[in-house]
């Protein structure tokens, strides 16, 4: 498939030369397509970079679907399998992923926009796991459920950043981090602690805002009174 061939060539060239030094022409030549063809699929180098991230999420989803008894895994096991599968599939392209991180964090706003589809695909997998766990009563219904998958995305981004800097043999430190942190996340979900904490913060925030608005009203009352007298006393 032409699209996948272009993406594979982009990964190879960017990994070898870095994002800034890689050229669309060289990627097209490596993919054995014409210069016009590559622009039909990917108008910019950035779209190539982030397009591969999207493709990687589709590969992860397919890999999980091929596990026959995946639906029988506990939520903790599913989240751990997701995280480990991501790392395993990114391993051959670790240098490329480092380029993704460099570009994304050098321009965070643009990076967030460019990663939107990748993030959506990842979050969808997490949402499926959480929803299934709630349906069978493995975990209680979660307040602010829509925030859980984005929070796991943020967590996983941190795992990737840690992994890219991990120089332990076989990335053993990353393995330990994932084992311990996923266990903690599963425990938090079983107690619906995130929702309860957000409820508490929401209550405290509303209370503080209410108090400050009352004080603000006291401060602004004289101004409003003075302004009314001024408006009422003009010649017009």
Task: Label each residue range with its predicted role.
Residues 9-13, 89:
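Short amphipathic alpha-helical elements of helix-turn-helix/winged-helix folds
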Residues 111-136, 146-158, 182-187:
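Amphipathic alpha-helical packing segments from all-alpha helical-bundle domains
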Residues 71-72, 132-141:
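Acidic/His metal-coordination segments adjacent to aromatic residues that form catalytic metal sites
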Residues 4, 8, 50, 101, ...:
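Soluble, non-transmembrane catalytic domains of enzymes that act on hydrophobic metabolites at membranes
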Residues 54-60:
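Short, basic, alpha-helical segments at the C-terminal edge of helix-turn-helix-like DNA-binding modules
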Residues 51, 65-99, 106-109, 113-121:
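Hydrophobic alpha-helical connector segments
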Residues 165-236:
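C-terminal peripheral helix-coil segments that are non-catalytic and often amphipathic
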Residues 5, 13-47, 51:
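Helix-turn-helix
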């Amino acid at each position: 498939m032409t699209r996948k061939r272009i993406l594979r060539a982009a990964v190879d060239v960017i990994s070898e030369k870095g994002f800034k030094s890689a050229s669309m022409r060289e990627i097209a030549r490596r993919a054995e397509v014409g210069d016009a063809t590559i622009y039909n699929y990917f108008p910019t180098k950035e779209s190539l970079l982030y397009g591969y991230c999207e493709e990687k999420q589709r590969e992860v989803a397919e890999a999980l679907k091929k596990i026959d008894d995946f639906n029988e895994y506990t939520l903790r096991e599913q989240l751990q399998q997701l995280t480990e599968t991501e790392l395993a599939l990114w391993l051959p392209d670790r240098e490329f992923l480092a380029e993704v991180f460099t570009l994304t964090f050098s321009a965070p706003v643009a990076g967030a926009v460019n990663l939107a589809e990748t993030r959506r695909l990842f979050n969808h997998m997490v949402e499926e796991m959480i929803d299934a766990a709630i349906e069978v009563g493995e975990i209680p219904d979660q307040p602010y459920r829509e925030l859980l998958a984005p929070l796991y995305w943020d967590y996983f981004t941190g795992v990737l950043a840690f992994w890219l800097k991990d120089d332990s043999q076989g990335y053993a430190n990353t393995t330990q981090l994932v084992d311990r942190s996923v266990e903690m996340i599963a425990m938090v979900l079983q107690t619906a602690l995130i929702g309860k904490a957000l409820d508490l913060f929401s209550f405290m925030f509303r209370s503080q805002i209410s108090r400050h608005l009352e004080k603000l009203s006291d401060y602004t009352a004289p101004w409003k009174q003075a302004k009314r007298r001024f408006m009422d006393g003009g010649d017009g």
